[in-house]
Design a protein with these regions (language model features):
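Glycine-rich, basic loop-to-helix element that forms the pyrophosphate-binding segment
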Residues: 65-81
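N-proximal low-complexity "stem/linker" segments adjacent to membrane-targeting elements
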Residues: 1-30
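Conserved nucleotide-sugar donor-binding catalytic segment
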Residues: 79, 138-188
Length: 188
């Protein structure tokens, strides 16, 4: 690769996700990405989430405090992020091996790109693929859609989307009044 690796910051919002967050963290830390900042924003969980987070002290930054929900947690994490490339990964989602290397390489070699999105798979707790129809639909639209299509349907998978800090500074924070479509609103 000719350009240097950009620093990537991943923010994970969490609340009472002790059963899943360890796998999420492992999927991020196992990426082997050379310049990674990982921030977990926990909403003062009452389950074992904080115990799980303590196991990763020194390998990520985590804060456990009350928040106003998922979007507030994401925004708090993005405010303290130092990466050139930003993303958020929910506490029950996983990155496939090599994902961040592919993202970093793409951003390094295409400095004009403001954001990047890719395909994803949706799996259950036993790693069985679910929602295949929706995933196929979104992945198909990725190849042919444009901004006009995005105004009609959200074909962008949040967990596979990354953007530059400059785009974040231009667009601002996610809209806290939206609880389920904040990502779609952000892409537009």
């Amino acid at each position: 690769m000719s350009a240097r690796w950009p620093r990537i910051t991943i923010v994970t919002p969490s609340y009472n996700q002790g059963a899943f967050i360890g796998q999420t963290i492992e999927s991020v830390l196992a990426q082997g990405y050379p310049d990674l900042e990982y921030i977990v924003m926990d909403g003062a969980s009452t389950d074992n989430t904080v115990e799980v987070l303590r196991q990763y002290d020194g390998r990520l930054t985590w804060i456990s405090e009350r928040d106003r929900g998922q979007v507030d947690a994401i925004n708090k994490g993005l405010r303290i992020a130092t990466g050139e490339v930003l993303a958020y990964l929910n506490s029950d989602d996983l990155y496939l091996p090599g994902a961040l290397l592919a993202v970093g390489r793409r951003f390094a070699n295409q400095p004009e790109s403001a954001w990047l999105t890719g395909r994803c798979r949706v799996v259950d707790q036993d790693n069985r693929e679910i929602r295949k129809g929706l995933t196929h639909y979104k992945n198909t639209w990725l190849r042919v859609a444009n901004y006009q299509t995005l105004q009609i349907t959200n074909f962008v998978s949040q967990m596979a989307t990354f953007w530059r800090r400059e785009a974040y500074q231009r667009v601002g924070e996610l809209n806290e009044s939206l609880h389920y479509v904040m990502d779609w609103d952000y892409w537009m």
